[in-house]
């Protein structure tokens, strides 16, 4: 799970300015970390369908934020997906 120390490290790495916690980059990075955690969780808990629904919501929210960022600033979008190792 995401500890406060992990969250602070992710926020510090992806923040666009001091104290930035709401930029799309930070939000996408936090969602990506949670998605990765849940993906690993499903390798040992195959029948956890309730959490799978939550995973689909997280993926959808991340997709919407990435679409927003691509529409507003394509260069920041491409830098972020490259840094996170997402597929595009």
Curated annotation (Swiss-Prot):
SMART domains: Ribosomal_S15 (SM01387). Signal peptide: none annotated. GO terms for cellular component: cytosolic small ribosomal subunit. GO terms for biological process: translation. Keywords: Ribonucleoprotein, Ribosomal protein, RNA-binding, rRNA-binding. CDD domains: Ribosomal_S15p_S13e. GO terms for molecular function: rRNA binding; structural constituent of ribosome. The keyword RNA-binding applies. InterPro entries: Ribosomal_uS15, Ribosomal_uS15_bac-type, uS15_NS1_RNA-bd_sf. One of the primary rRNA binding proteins, it binds directly to 16S rRNA where it helps nucleate assembly of the platform of the 30S subunit by binding and bridging several RNA helices of the 16S rRNA. Forms an intersubunit bridge (bridge B4) with the 23S rRNA of the 50S subunit in the ribosome. Belongs to the universal ribosomal protein uS15 family. Part of the 30S ribosomal subunit. Forms a bridge to the 50S subunit in the 70S ribosome, contacting the 23S rRNA. This is Small ribosomal subunit protein uS15. The gene is rpsO.
